[in-house]
């Protein structure tokens, strides 16, 4: 699936291809969500205060799904979810634990692979592959 996604430009994603990606994600029992349930018109990063308002909803999603692992993208989101200062560069391939309703979850901070994070996309891919190979 990864190679097929890499081989398509965003404008070439049609409904059929999107259905394929969603089906593959479902078959592999992956769940994808976003801490921020909104965005700004110009796609600027959201302030911490806005993202923190969505934490309860995210934790409810996690409590329902009960994932084996959680991957967070970028310093900002990783820090908010883990409630401590996180620098992805210092936490590559390391997990932190969070507890939600007496269930513990492994959280792996990973570089945000788009926007300004595009410069670290190779590291993000490397870390995600490592996490999959070692955790799934």
Task: Please give the residue ranges for each predicted region.
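Short acidic-hydrophobic surface loop/beta-edge motif
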Residues: 91-101
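A polyanion-binding, active-site-adjacent surface
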Residues: 1-90, 104-119, 123, 130-131
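Short, hydrophobic alpha-helical segments
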Residues: 132-136
């Amino acid at each position: 699936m990864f190679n097929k996604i890499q081989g398509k430009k965003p404008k070439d994603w049609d409904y059929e291809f999107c259905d394929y990606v969603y089906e593959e994600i479902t078959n592999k029992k992956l769940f994808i969500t976003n801490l921020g349930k909104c965005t700004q018109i110009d796609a600027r990063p959201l302030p911490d205060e806005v993202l923190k308002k969505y934490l309860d909803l995210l934790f409810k999603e996690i409590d329902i799904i009960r994932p084996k692992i959680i991957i967070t993208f970028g310093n900002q989101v990783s820090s908010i979810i883990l409630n401590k200062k996180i620098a992805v560069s210092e936490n590559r391939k390391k997990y932190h634990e969070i507890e939600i309703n007496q269930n513990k979850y492994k959280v792996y901070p990973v570089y945000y692979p788009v926007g300004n994070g595009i410069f670290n996309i190779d590291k993000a891919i490397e870390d995600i592959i490592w996490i999959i190979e070692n955790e799934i």
